[in-house]
């Protein structure tokens, strides 16, 4: 406990709050004030690199801002404090102003070969909706392209997992 709710209130000794997942990726601004970092896209590729970089910077005794500026250069890493949301007169989002030397656009990360990553996940906490379940990911995305659906509209091309690999993981 005792992690400050707003990113702007966190100090040098506080942990970084990292957000990810589909909702944070496709509309991070409602949560921007709470996050130190947001992973844009699929985290499997970028998360190990991000954590290695944070550890390297910590060992080099970099301060919080230096660490955040450094990881903001990684593809797929959005550091909200270095951007300011801009809105039109009607309140519609119009873009981001850069407050530091950071990328103007964040490159959404995309796992090219989903079979390179685990097919299954066992949730062992009793405090989740899927408590004590064995989850199997058979595909990502959707080919239907419904404009109201994030999975179909934002991820477009479906990526199906290899059936033999799925069956092997399930049997284990």
Give the positions of each predicted feature.
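Short, exposed beta-strand "edge-strand" segments with a Pro/Gly-rich flavor and a Y/T-containing core
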Residues: 61, 105-108, 158-160
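Radical SAM [4Fe-4S] cluster-binding motif and immediate context
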Residues: 112-172
């Amino acid at each position: 406990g005792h992690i400050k709710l707003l990113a702007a209130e966190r100090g040098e000794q506080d942990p970084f709050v990292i957000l990810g997942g589909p909702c944070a990726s496709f509309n991070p601004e409602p949560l921007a004030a709470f996050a130190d970092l947001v992973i844009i896209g699929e985290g499997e590729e970028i998360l190990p690199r991000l954590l290695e970089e944070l550890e390297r910077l910590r060992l080099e005794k970099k301060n919080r801002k230096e660490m955040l500026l450094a990881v903001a250069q990684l593809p797929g890493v959005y550091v909200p404090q270095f951007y300011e949301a801009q809105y039109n007169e009607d309140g519609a989002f119009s873009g981001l102003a850069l407050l530091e030397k950071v990328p103007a656009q964040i490159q959404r990360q995309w796992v090219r070969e989903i079979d390179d990553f685990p097919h299954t996940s066992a949730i062992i906490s009793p405090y989740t909706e899927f408590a004590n379940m064995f989850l199997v990911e058979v595909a990502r995305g959707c080919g239907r392209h419904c404009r109201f659906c994030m999975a179909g509209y934002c991820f477009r091309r479906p990526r199906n997992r290899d059936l033999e690999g799925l069956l092997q993981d399930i049997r284990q």
